[in-house]
């Protein structure tokens, strides 16, 4: 019995968010093969990253591993729509799912084949959709240019002594953890206030489950990684990529983690889980932790995860 079979049998069906860089991996194939109940969760950004008007063949090739498991693929709603969901109405992992796109995934793969075989009308439609996806991606990534100002604003919640402590490799003290939570809350409230149309606040119990708060939390962990290393700037193209990495880490906290080969994504996700659980937020178990336990290994500590990001 393989490791994925072992943890699926013990823990039940697993739902794991898949990064673009893991779409064609043997790990994903093993995960889906282990149980017909396991699910590969695809956020909109995963499709957007692969959806390029001039290279639809790469899109088809990128789906080569998951295509035979089309009924195990779950497509999420757009991040903008998810940001408006109120967790008081329905638990977010269920409410996030785009039922229509999920049901149509297998058919989409077949249409992609037909388009690439020369069916002009389908090819045109897919290229138009790809152009739309790239436009949406550009809108989302636009805010990445504000990185230096955002970092300085976040760092201002901590004292010079706090920052020095972090740069010496110290972990967050309880007081610093409280400051972190305050900073994250301030960012989330600011987003609520600046929304183009009014957003409904959830109950205090469900505030940590709202996507805006959860993404602000993961983004705060991302900011901490730069404060700890004394880095005050980020190349625009890297900052744009980081936006997607943090979003994937955020999605992973709603499911059984994120399957990714990216150090930043894994770091932000792991530390965010650790801090959320320290705040009393209940999360589904991370599949990597389940694998480590099944193999008799301890999962990485927050300090070990922090060291993995050096040089990212």
State where each predicted segment sits:
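Active-site-proximal, substrate-binding regions of enzyme catalytic domains
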Residues: 2-254, 264-312
